[in-house]
């Protein structure tokens, strides 16, 4: 057991280092090649934070472990919203931009529901994967087109994170190429160790590969998003903390699940449990973002606590279902009777009250939260 846990942790460390090397070297090479920091930020850097999910899911599907791939994406999306935004909102109430409310969050809801529909026949096939990847290309193209007017701000943000955008020497290019190759190799190696250890751990604990994917693998591969969002909240960059999570979830659905569906002739199989519980939870979590984001365009601290409580409840259900199945009925009854309805009523009242506020008082309320 100790060796398995050590391999799991080591694989995660190698995976994270590989992702960091890949993002930094690819970003500098892209800028040196004349690609604008705006495009780099929307593609290389954004995709880089989800590189662990991508490599783990594609590799798992390729090696005949689709439950890990599906569990990783679904679990990561649930983890990103409930845990990462929950912790970030506890640090400081998070600002939500109009762009997210009007476009990105509805898109996240629609894509989550679309995946549920695709999975209804028990698998995510190559056609489904191709449609999702095509959607990602369209989304990135639209994002680049819409963000060109913010070019100066994006350049400044890129330079503060990755350094000046000046040209680099031949030696610098060779070094970054080597770092790119090393980063990619570490990603693949770390993913192999991480997935292998997770599978062994699941069997030793008597849990399914799906549950391990939804919990340990999902949490581990989401570490770049954890670091980015929490650091942004601490620095007071509250819109970045929210945008990072929503953007990561969109890429997980379109990019990670899409490519996972493409690499296997059989596609990504979807278990009845995932179809009846975990994917609906992902859809519900995405949908819950809309009323919470809408109220004052802020995620308040009490809403952060609510997110954390629900993630704890969901994780507890997964663990009890795998280890003490006789408690499932009681747990479901308590959640459906005493927890979910009061929460839904509270959110509905908050939305109605916020909608009835005059614009001036709403602005004052936002200022008092800051």
Question: For each of these PLM feature ranges, what is it?
Answer:
Residues 1-370:
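Hydrophobic alpha-helical segments, chiefly the membrane-spanning helices
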């Amino acid at each position: 057991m100790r060796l398995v846990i050590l391999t799991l942790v080591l694989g995660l460390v190698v995976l994270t280092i590989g992702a960091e090397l890949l993002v930094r070297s690819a970003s500098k090479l892209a800028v040196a090649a004349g690609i604008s920091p705006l495009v780099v930020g929307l593609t290389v850097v954004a995709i880089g934070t989800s590189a662990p999910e991508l490599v783990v899911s594609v590799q798992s599907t390729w090696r005949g472990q689709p439950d890990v791939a599906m569990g990783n994406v679904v679990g990561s999306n649930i983890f990103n919203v409930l845990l990462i935004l929950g912790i970030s909102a506890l640090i400081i109430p998070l600002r939500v931009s109009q762009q997210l409310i009007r476009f990105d969050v509805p898109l996240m809801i629609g894509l989550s529901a679309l995946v549920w529909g695709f999975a209804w026949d028990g698998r995510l096939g190559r056609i489904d994967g191709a449609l999702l990847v095509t959607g990602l290309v369209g989304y990135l193209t639209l994002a680049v087109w819409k963000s060109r007017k913010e070019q100066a701000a994006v350049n400044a943000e890129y330079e503060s994170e990755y350094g000046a955008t000046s040209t680099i020497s031949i030696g610098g290019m060779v070094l970054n190429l080597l770092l790119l190759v090393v980063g990619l190799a570490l990603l693949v190696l770390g993913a192999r160790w991480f997935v292998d250890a997770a599978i062994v751990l699941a069997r030793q604990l008597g849990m399914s590969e799906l549950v391990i994917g939804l919990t340990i693998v999902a949490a581990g591969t989401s570490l770049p998003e954890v670091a980015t969002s929490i650091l942004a909240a601490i620095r007071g960059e509250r819109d970045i903390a929210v945008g990072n999570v929503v953007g990561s979830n969109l890429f997980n659905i379109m990019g990670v699940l899409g490519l996972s569906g493409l690499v296997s002739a059989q596609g990504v199989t979807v278990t009845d449990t995932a179809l009846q519980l975990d994917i609906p939870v992902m859809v519900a979590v995405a949908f819950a973002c809309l009323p919470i984001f809408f109220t004052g365009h802020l995620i308040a601290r009490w809403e952060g606590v609510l997110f954390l409580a629900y993630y704890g409840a969901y994780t507890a259900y997964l663990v009890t279902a795998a280890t003490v199945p006789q408690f499932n009925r009681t747990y479901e009854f308590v959640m459906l009777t005493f927890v979910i309805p009061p929460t839904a009523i509270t959110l509905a009242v908050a939305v109605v009250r916020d909608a009835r506020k005059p614009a001036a008082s709403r602005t004052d309320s936002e200022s008092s939260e800051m």
